[in-house]
Curated annotation (Swiss-Prot):
<feature type="topological domain" description="Cytoplasmic">
    <location>
        <begin position="146"/>
        <end position="163"/>
    </location>
</feature>
<feature type="topological domain" description="Extracellular">
    <location>
        <begin position="254"/>
        <end position="263"/>
    </location>
</feature>
<dbReference type="GO" id="GO:0035176">
    <property type="term" value="P:social behavior"/>
</dbReference>
<dbReference type="InterPro" id="IPR013821">
    <property type="entry name" value="K_chnl_volt-dep_KCNQ_C"/>
</dbReference>
<dbReference type="GO" id="GO:0050890">
    <property type="term" value="P:cognition"/>
</dbReference>
<dbReference type="GO" id="GO:0006897">
    <property type="term" value="P:endocytosis"/>
</dbReference>
<keyword id="KW-1133">Transmembrane helix</keyword>
<feature type="transmembrane region" description="Helical; Name=Segment S2">
    <location>
        <begin position="124"/>
        <end position="145"/>
    </location>
</feature>
<feature type="compositionally biased region" description="Basic and acidic residues">
    <location>
        <begin position="583"/>
        <end position="592"/>
    </location>
</feature>
<dbReference type="Pfam" id="PF00520">
    <property type="entry name" value="Ion_trans"/>
</dbReference>
<feature type="transmembrane region" description="Helical; Name=Segment S3">
    <location>
        <begin position="164"/>
        <end position="183"/>
    </location>
</feature>
<feature type="short sequence motif" description="Selectivity filter">
    <location>
        <begin position="277"/>
        <end position="282"/>
    </location>
</feature>
<dbReference type="GO" id="GO:0005249">
    <property type="term" value="F:voltage-gated potassium channel activity"/>
</dbReference>
<comment type="similarity">
    <text>Belongs to the potassium channel family. KQT (TC 1.A.1.15) subfamily. Kv7.2/KCNQ2 sub-subfamily.</text>
</comment>
<keyword id="KW-0851">Voltage-gated channel</keyword>
<dbReference type="Pfam" id="PF11956">
    <property type="entry name" value="KCNQC3-Ank-G_bd"/>
</dbReference>
<feature type="intramembrane region" description="Pore-forming; Name=Segment H5">
    <location>
        <begin position="264"/>
        <end position="276"/>
    </location>
</feature>
Length: 852
């Protein structure tokens, strides 16, 4: 039987059984589960496929020998030698100092060998040093070639050839060949050959170049020259022009009189030695013309010839300072990396986050509980016992987080030791195999291969190293919910192990589903403290290196501030708008000015809104003027009302006269006799004129407002109430001009007969507020404004109008599709229109009759 792992693979059985290939269930062609949907499509043909890591058998089983340690030692030695030769640090400089002294000694002896007095004494020592140098350099060269294999790009024979083609390796092989040639020629005793090959000894000067294996000095020089290349080219170019011009003019002046300037080449030599401030004195001008020209060009040319030295010096100084600053900045890498790591763990160990598991898995693998191994008397095996000072802690862990402790016999005793969580996980019933069912003496403990090897070597030591498979199994064991599911599952054994069922009689396992809350809180506290410490260390590493560093930080901050201000200014310009100023020259001189394009800025939009509000205000003024004209309100009183902005009046006061008028209103009702003429027009009988003393007219609109009461829509504080037309001005006396008929109408209007009933006044809204107008009424007219009054109120008003002007046509309602402005009265401009008949004192107010 085999056990399927989480990834769908299987562990191979014993050597006696059929070996199963590790793979995914349902993906192998011809497998029992290959009939699943999509399995054949994924598997493809049965041709041999490329092997993967899952297909490789597990190495280092119980029957296998020790893993070869030569590979690890081989790689370690390669890395060590490569670092010593190519990247020396610390005590590795001792070897390079020894090589430098050896090369320098050979160079000094080569110099002394050219002197006749020291030739014989220096040749013997030089011969010995040459042999030592050749041996050292030869061995070092081959070691370099071999150690370069630690780098991935230099592995294999092609990689070695690539490493051998490096410039410094080429110099090494050239010096080695030259040294061997010189040594071979000197050992033959041939005088001619020795004198001819003696010059090859100076090839040993190239050995000094190899002292700088990494080429730091050459890189520094190249970076300085490249950084100041423009300045150097300018100085050299102008200096070269001065050299040519000065040499040519001095040559022309000294050609016939001075033998030192016979050719132009002599003049160039003189100019170069003079402008470079060397001045050998072998050539000099003798005529006064030549001396004057030489002095003039010397003052100009020397300054340009000296410029490259200053440029290179300052460049070297700046570059070295920059390198020191860069090294100082590199010291911030470790604190920054530690801060990032601690910040992530501080974030990931938040107890409220339930979606982050990797950090907790790290602590699950690293947390250990010390245990004591003691030998049992029954089976002669050892079991894990916690120390006395940790019994209470383990009891609490067991009670809080479901930790399970069970006894298990161990195959061999061991002294007191600190057992890691991995050992306790693998000393589980999953690792217990018995030859006979129910026989505890035959039980064995399954361990990892590394543990078996270490126990064979030294039984008293605890196995510390465990393979990747053991770690994966440990992570799986951490998440096992209970023992029942583990006992029912099938077991898988490594090669060389017996496959048996679990022994349920004697089990011992330390299994935890998750860390305890208390342990999590402790880990959280440690992460917080580490984060604070890392933050403090990183802040300490951010201290400025020098004054230039401070200035650089301030300049960088200033540039950042300027960029932010520029961005803010652009956004402000986009919002406010910054249009180009239009001058008189740019204006088009024409009869009609062209419309300017709309400004997309916020200020342009606000201006457009203001224009629309102004247009709406004009329309409202126009509608209010129509209302005042229709209701007969004088403009002076309306302006006084809106200008004063008086508060709402008190509740209406009912005077005794109003009560008496209310009591006598039924006696003053005038019966209106309607008759129809042959043309179909209505004729109204005029009521008798009542004396004005019986019903005194009102003198102000406040009294009229008090008499009418409150509006049906309510007196809300946010509504602007338009005053009702006064009783003595409803006939529009401003248009009639004080006629006698208007005076009679005012008298008639003051009578109770002409006064509308209280119910009509209550139902109608004579005191009209603008928000009380219904939307349906607004849609009836083209002007968007209409006034609704009850039919009874309009009939009563019509009777009063008929008393004075019987021929006037009264239109109490407005037909659909017709607006208030359709009548001649509502014309906003021009003189007041006449009536249809043009007669009567109220012709100005009467509406025109229907058109025939």
């Amino acid at each position: 039987m085999v056990q399927k792992s989480r990834n769908g693979g299987v562990y191979p059985g014993t050597s006696g059984e059929k070996k199963l290939k590790v793979g995914f269930v349902g993906l192998d062609p011809g497998a029992p589960d290959s009939t699943r949907d999509g399995a054949l499509l994924i598997a493809g043909s049965e041709a041999p496929k490329r092997g993967s890591v899952l297909s490789k058998p597990r190495t280092g089983g119980a029957g296998a020998g020790k893993p070869p340690k030569r590979n690890a030692f081989y790689r370690k030695l390669q890395n060590f030698l490569y670092n010593v030769l190519e990247r020396p640090r610390g005590w590795a400089f001792i070897y390079h100092a020894y090589v430098f002294l050896l090369v320098f000694s050979c160079l000094v002896l080569s110099v002394f060998s050219t002197i006749k007095e020291y030739e014989k004494s220096s040749e013997g020592a030089l011969y010995i040093l040459e042999i030592v140098t050749i041996v050292v350099f030869g061995v070092e060269y081959f070691v370099r070639i071999w150690a370069a294999g630690c780098c991935c790009r230099y592995r294999g024979w092609r990689g070695r050839l690539k490493f051998a083609r490096k410039p410094f390796c080429v110099i090494d092989i050239m010096v080695l060949i030259a040294s061997i040639a010189v040594l071979a020629a000197g050992s033959q005793g041939n005088v001619f050959a020795t004198s001819a090959l003696r010059s090859l000894r100076f090839l040993q000067i190239l050995r000094m170049i190899r002292m700088d294996r990494r080429g730091g000095t050459w890189k520094l020089l190249g970076s300085v020259v490249y950084a100041h290349s423009k300045e150097l080219v300018t100085a050299w170019y102008i200096g070269f022009l001065c050299l040519i011009l000065a040499s040519f003019l001095v040559y022309l002046a000294e050609k016939g009189e001075n033998d030192h300037f016979d050719t132009y080449a002599d003049a160039l030599w003189w100019g170069l030695i003079t402008l470079t401030t060397i001045g050998y004195g072998d050539k000099y001008p003798q005529t006064w013309n030549g001396r004057l020209l030489a002095a003039t060009f010397t003052l100009i040319g020397v300054s340009f010839f000296a410029l490259p030295a200053g440029i290179l010096g300052s460049g070297f100084a700046l570059k070295v300072q920059e390198q020191h600053r860069q090294k100082h900045f590199e010291k911030r890498r470790n604190p920054a990396a530690g801060l990032i790591q601690s910040a992530w763990r501080f974030y990931a160990t938040n107890l409220s986050r339930t979606d982050l598991h990797s950090t907790w898995q790290y602590y699950e693998r690293t947390v250990t509980v010390p245990m004591i191994s003691s030998q049992t008397q029954t089976y002669g095996a050892s079991r894990l016992i916690p120390p006395l000072n940790q019994l209470e802690m383990l009891r609490n862990l067991k009670s809080k987080s479901g930790l399970t402790f069970r006894k298990e016999p161990q195959p061999e005793p061991s002294p007191s030791q600190k057992v890691s969580l991995k050992d306790r996980v693998f000393s589980s019933p999953r690792g217990v195999a018995a030859k006979g069912k129910g026989s505890p003496q035959a039980q064995t403990v399954r361990r990892s291969p590394s543990a078996d090897q270490s126990l064979d070597d030294s039984p008293s030591k605890v196995p510390k190293s465990w393979s990747f498979g053991d770690r994966s199994r440990a992570r799986q064991a951490f998440r096992i919910k209970g023992a029942a599911s583990r006992q029912n599952s099938e077991e898988a054994s490594l090669p060389g192990e017996d496959i048996v069922e679990d022994n349920k009689s004697c089990n011992c396992e330390f299994v935890t589903e998750d860390l305890t809350p208390g342990l999590k809180v402790s880990i959280r506290a440690v992460c917080v403290m580490r984060f604070l410490v890392s933050k403090r260390k990183f802040k300490e590493s951010l201290r400025p290196y020098d004054v230039m560093d401070v200035i650089e930080q301030y300049s960088a901050g200033h540039l950042d501030m300027l960029s932010r201000i520029k961005s803010l200014q652009s956004r402000v310009d986009q919002i406010v708008g910054r249009g180009p100023t239009i001058t008189d020259k740019d204006r088009t001189k024409g009869p009609a000015e062209t419309e300017l394009p709309e400004d997309p800025s916020m200020m342009g939009r606000l201006g457009k809104v203001e224009k629309q509000v102004l247009s709406m205000e004009k329309k409202l003024d126009f509608l209010v003027s129509i209302y005042t004209q229709r209701m007969g309100i004088p403009p002076a009183e309306t302006e006084a009302y809106f200008g004063a902005k008086e508060p709402e009046p008190a509740p209406p006061y009912h005077s005794p006269e109003d009560s008496r008028d209310h009591a006598d209103k039924h006696g003053c009702i005038i019966k209106i006799v309607r008759s129809t003429s042959s043309t179909g027009q209505r004729k109204y009988a005029a009521p008798p004129v009542m004396p004005p003393a019986e019903c005194p007219p009102s003198t102000s609109w406040q009294q009229s407002h008090q008499r009418h009461g409150t509006s049906p829509v309510g007196d809300h504080g946010s509504l602007v109430r338009i005053p009702p037309p006064p009783a003595h001005e409803r006939s529009l006396s401003a248009y009639s001009g004080g006629n006698r008929a208007s005076t009679e109408f005012l008298r008639l209007e003051g009578t109770p007969a002409c006064r509308p009933s209280e119910a009509a006044l209550r139902d109608s809204d004579t005191s009209i507020s603008i928000p009380s107008v219904d939307h349906e009424e607004l849609e009836r007219s083209f002007s968007g404004f209409s006034i609704s009054q009850s039919k009874e109120n309009l009939n009563a008003l019509a009777s009063c109008y008929a008393a004075v002007a019987p021929c006037a046509k009264v239109r109490p309602y407005i037909a659909e599709g017709e607006s208030d402005t359709d009548s001649d009265l509502c014309t906003p401009c021009g003189p007041p229109p006449r009536s249809a008949t043009g007669e009567g004192p109220f012709g100005d107010v009467a509406w025109a009759g229907p058109r025939k």
